[in-house]
Regions:
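Short glycine-rich, Thr/Ser-proximal phosphate-binding strand/loop in the N-terminal lobe
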Residues: 12-56
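Residue-level signal for inorganic ion chemistry
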Residues: 7, 31, 87, 147
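Extreme N-terminal starter segment of soluble prokaryotic enzymes
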Residues: 1-4
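Electropositive phosphate-/nucleotide-binding environments in soluble metabolic enzymes
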Residues: 56-60, 64, 102, 106, ...
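Short glycine/proline- and acidic residue-enriched helix-loop micro-motifs
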Residues: 51-52, 111-116, 169-173
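Short beta-strand-loop/turn "lid" adjacent to the catalytic site in phosphate-handling enzymes
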Residues: 70, 74-122, 143, 150-158
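Conserved active-site "lid/cap" helical segment
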Residues: 37-85, 129
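ATP-dependent carbohydrate kinase catalytic cores
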Residues: 123, 127, 134-185
Length: 185
């Protein structure tokens, strides 16, 4: 099974294609400087990096370029985007709503969007990346892997800050424990 993994940052998009059965990385790369003079880096397994400038006014175009590169007849690792069996998206902030990786349905995406105030630099571009993937790969399952999910088992005495409790109740101010995917996977 080939899984495309995407991590949308505020002005970048990191990606890998992984064979989930062997856990081998088949290709990886990075779209940098999204919104200005974009640069795409692509590296098939066991080969040198390929780097070129490309117009990427937004994350949508970055996703399109990644899919185009992965299916490039000269050095792409896929004959067709239909070979992508699933897409995993790094989701920075799911608030207290998600305690595990989650299939990205319309309802889930609305809930993630409601957490945008908690991660204003990360959640919006991630949601744009998810929307682009859903449009370009409409029958491919999309899964969100939440940074905040790993730490959902912290007891309240570990996640409540020494601030007025109303900040937690009103603004969801608490310790979330980020980079959970680095701990779990």
């Amino acid at each position: 099974m080939k899984v495309l993994v995407i991590n949308c940052g505020s002005s970048s998009l990191k990606y890998q294609v992984i064979d989930s059965e062997t856990e081998h990385v088949l290709a990886k790369g990075l779209c940098e400087r999204i919104g200005i003079d974009g640069v795409l880096t692509y590296q098939p397994a066991g080969q040198d990096k390929i780097k070129y400038e490309a117009a990427m006014p937004a994350h949508r175009q970055a996703v399109e370029l990644v899919l185009k590169q992965l299916t490039n007849p000269e050095n792409g690792i896929l004959k067709s985007i239909d070979e992508i069996d699933a897409v995993g998206h790094r989701m920075v902030h799911g608030g207290e709503k998600f305690a595990c990786s989650t299939l990205l349905t319309d309802d889930v995406l609305k809930t993630v969007e409601s957490c945008n105030d908690l991660a204003p630099l990360h959640n919006p571009p991630t949601l744009v990346g998810v929307a682009a993937c859903r449009e370009l790969l409409p029958t491919t399952p999309m899964v969100g892997v939440f940074d905040t999910a790993f730490h959902q088992t912290m007891p309240p005495e570990a996640y409540i800050y020494g601030l007025p409790y109303e900040y937690y109740e009103k603004y969801a101010v608490r310790r979330y424990g980020f980079h959970g995917t680095s701990h779990k996977y």
